[in-house]
Structure formats: C-alpha cells, structure tokens
C-alpha cells in the first residue's frame, strides 16, 4: 500500500531543510555505513501518531542556472506533481514577500491540501505577527520554530488530517515491483514490452498521488503483479523530468512502494554516478533487486562481452553482489520473457524464513571452519542466531560482546548463510546482540 507523500515547499531561506530534519528525525532513509553509496537527503520515511508517510525536501531540488522565479516555480510544480499534502513554509522574519505570494498562487491552483507553517517563531512575542499570513489564503497559519522544534505537533496533526483515504489492498500473493534507473536507460520501453499483447492488463489503479498509476497484470502462469508508478516512467515533456534530483525522488517513491526493484542500466552507455545513487537507495531500503542491463542489442559483442560487463557491474556495485544480472533488449524483446519468473524468484527469497535449528547448524559449522576473532586474549563467542524478520531477511546473532563482531566476520557468516540457502536477489541484515 502506497504511503502518503508530504512535500515541504517554500522560497529559499525559510528553513525547509531544518524542518525536514526535525520531522524526519532519526528516520532519514539513508544510512551512513554502506560503502560505495552516494548519499542525498532529499527523501525520508517518517511517522506521526502511528501514520507513516514519505517526506520530500524540495529545498534539495536545485534547478541549475534557472532564474529565481523560475526555480521556485519549478520547485512548487514538482511538489504539486508528487505530493498528497503540501507543507507551505514561510518565515516570520521577512513577513509576506512577493515570492511567497507567487508560490501561493501556484499552490492555490493545484487543489492539493496545503498546510501553512510560519517558521522562525522562536519566541512568544513573535506569535502576534503570524496573523499577517492569513492573507496567503490557506486558512490557519501554524507558528513553528525549526531551531527549537516548537509547534511541529500541531502542524503534523493538520497534515495527517489531510491524508487521502486508503484504497483497497492488493490481492494476496500479488508482487509489487518497480523499474528504477536514471532517465533514458529504457525503462518506458521495458514497461511497454512487459505490458504487451501477451500480458493480461487487469486495470490501471490510481495511487494516492494525482498521477501515480500502478498497473496490474498477470503473467502466463496466472501470477499477479503490480508495476509501480508506470505513469511516472512514461511521463514525458516536463521541463524538470530529466533533472537528476527529480528523477531520483520519483525513484525513491517507487522503491518505497515495491517488493522488488528492477534496476535498469543502459548497456550502451555504461554506469554513471546517478546509477550508483539510485541503486544505493534500493539496497538501503532492503528491497529485492534485479540488475537489468538494457539496450544489449546495441552493444558490440564477442564471446567474452557479457562476462566482462558483469565483472564491470560487480566492481562498480560491490554492495549488490547478491543481485542477479540479466541482459535484455526492450527493442528486440531479448530475454524479457524471463523477467516475471526472475521477479517471482527474488520475491520468494526476499520472504524466505529459516528454521532456527537449521540456521544454527549452519552458523556453528561456519565457526568450526573459521573460528571467531579474538582481541587481547578475549574471543568473540557466538551463542545462537535466529531470524526475526523477512523483506529483507533479518537475523539476530546473540554474542558475548557485539563490539567484537568485525565487519569482515559478519560478512563471512552472511556468505555462509547464502551458501546454505537461496537468498539471491535480496539483501540480508545481520544484527548482533549481547546475550543477557
């Protein structure tokens, strides 16, 4: 089920990023310890009063070399395009400015719910000036202080009241997948090929955002799929469509609402920095991942080309060593018929549960083969392990001292688990806990 999307909009220097960080708190979706991942804090998962939602910081969307008014106009348009609810942020210090009124006009025409936050109300004496902002036409302005974290509860109460009603859940057994990747790698061609004459299209189901259409279809075996955000992939002609941060933001939403992500690379152009950014998000979100090398028909090949390109991918995406790679051509339909089966396999692995007794046999055999590390005469002791979650499979290992579990030994244990059980296509999370 798609989570509601909340966007923070406003002219520069009103404190959008501060408010973003306050609301996101420690739930910002990018973790700090994955090697090789390019980080960008434009998007976070958050929660208020038990309601989960995705948060967009449009302050992080830079339209390079654009005039000031054009920049804030495009920023507002992006928010309108993506959000279910908009937090319109202004500043008490400057009062109502021409730029504020310009953004207000765009938001007013959008018919999206708008909650007006007046930032930088850092002391009670300033509260009387908040009433000036009624002139913007969005009802009660909410006085807040990003610097001190004041007033955010009332603001978020108003935000969640405007969330759309939930639509029906997917039928049991339905697999949700998305195609992610930078612009022009051929995602739309793959969509059209997958939804061709040999597919039964059940319906186009409107998501919680205005134009995020999720497409249901069944494969030749009768298994059900939902392709997430086909509208976003197919959409053309918008000025900001090919700006990197917009496409990353769209990919993040699709990843968040998927079980499996098909990470599409342009085989003719190779790997770019933006590819690494999008792949990093999917990995850190714990989704099942398939690497799809498209436009393979355009690559000059010999008997070693595929193996060499696969080695190139493994070198560039060390943290995706578990992800299967498939070489396709949307133009010629090469290997596209294999994708539904591969998606089903990865989804099965993503949901795999291992019985504790069997898991511990594997762990103890691994330790017998490669003893645990020691430090200053003290040896790491592993008592037992258990699986605590799926999607992704998550294992807790109970030890005498979690600090002694070196990254390399944790990786060794993970590899032994992978050797014993089929977890291809899914990350594995390992958590060390001290035995009480």
From Swiss-Prot:
GO molecular function: GTP binding; ribosome binding
Alphabetically ordered keywords of this record: GTP-binding, Nucleotide-binding, Repeat, Ribosome biogenesis
Recorded superkingdom: Bacteria
Residues holding GTP 2: 181-188, 229-233, 294-297
Domain EngA-type G: 4-167, 175-351
Residues in KH-like domain copies: 352-436
Any single Pfam family the record assigns to this protein: KH_dom-like
Coiled coil feature spans: none
Keyword Secreted in record: no
GO BP annotations listed: ribosome biogenesis
Annotated GTP 1 binding sites: 10-17, 57-61, 119-122
Family: Belongs to the TRAFAC class TrmE-Era-EngA-EngB-Septin-like GTPase superfamily. EngA (Der) GTPase family.
The protein's assembly and partners: Associates with the 50S ribosomal subunit.
Annotated function: GTPase that plays an essential role in the late steps of ribosome biogenesis.
Protein's UniProt name: GTPase Der
Species name: Lactiplantibacillus plantarum (strain ATCC BAA-793 / NCIMB 8826 / WCFS1)
Classification of source organism: Bacteria, Bacillati, Bacillota, Bacilli, Lactobacillales
